[in-house]
Amino acid sequence: MQIIVRDNNVDQALRALKKKLQREGVYREMKLRRHYEKPSEKRARERAAAVRRARKMERKRMERDGIK
């Protein structure tokens, strides 16, 4: 990953770097890898995330279609 420092403005470059890392999910990955996660716990976490995504998509679909 490369960030260009323009006009010796390191603060702006750091903000850009943090934004890029956030967008690519590096912080989330670091948090997950901080401790070992058992395969069963990983499956449960991923299953819960899938349920949350499905519910969110259903809510958005219902909102878009005008159903409440």
UniProtKB/Swiss-Prot annotation:
Family annotation (InterPro entries):
Ribosomal_bS21, Ribosomal_bS21_CS, Ribosomal_bS21_sf
Kindly indicate whether the keyword Ribonucleoprotein belongs to this entry.
yes
- One GO molecular function term? structural constituent of ribosome
Disordered as annotated region, ranges: 35-68
Q: In which residue ranges is the amino acid composition biased (Basic and acidic residues)? A: 37-49
For this entry, list what GO says about its biological process.
translation
Which residues fall in a compositionally biased region of kind Basic residues?
50-59
> Domain of life of the organism in this record?
Bacteria
Q: Name one GO cellular component term.
A: ribonucleoprotein complex
TM ranges are none
Protein name per its UniProtKB record: Small ribosomal subunit protein bS21
Organism name: Sphingopyxis alaskensis (strain DSM 13593 / LMG 18877 / RB2256) (Sphingomonas alaskensis)
